[in-house]
Amino acid sequence: MKYPLLALIKLYQWTISPLLGPVCKYYPSCSHYGYTAIDRHGAVKGTALTAWRILRCNPWSLGGVDHVPPRKRPRWHEMLRAAWRARKGGTSAAEPATEGRPAHPSSSDPSSPAAETSPHAQGA
């Protein structure tokens, strides 16, 4: 359902929006906001955010900058992740298994890749 809605917004942006000109008081425009909201949050929540934005875009509104809110991780997702960690024995992705290696390669070890790479190298 997400992609047909995104296609409708793109169709509007390519056909109707150029005829109307820049009339939106907000940045990004309502159609760009809607596209981003549906792409980021999905069809249901993105459509609700877009409808609320269009309702706010009226002659009595001052306008301004109004970005799409970031996607939040749902509470049930955090509970599921905690249960999964407890089942696996408490290891998490933040604590990688080192298998006898030091967690941070020291620059004193000449065989480590960190000793060969300059601290100002790209990607370091």
Curated annotation (Swiss-Prot):
The keyword DNA-binding does not apply. Its main location: membrane. InterPro entries: Membr_insert_effic_factor_YidD (IPR002696). The lineage of its organism: Bacteria, Bacillati, Actinomycetota, Actinomycetes, Kitasatosporales. Residues 103-124 have a biased composition (Low complexity). Transmembrane segments: none annotated. Signal peptide: none annotated. This is Putative membrane protein insertion efficiency factor. HAMAP family: UPF0161_YidD. PANTHER family: MEMBRANE PROTEIN INSERTION EFFICIENCY FACTOR-RELATED. Residues 86-124 are annotated as: Disordered. One of its GO terms (cellular component) is plasma membrane. NCBIfam families: membrane protein insertion efficiency factor YidD. Could be involved in insertion of integral membrane proteins into the membrane. It comes from Streptomyces coelicolor (strain ATCC BAA-471 / A3(2) / M145). Belongs to the UPF0161 family. It is found in: Cell membrane. It is a peripheral membrane protein. Pfam families: YidD. Keywords: Cell membrane, Membrane.
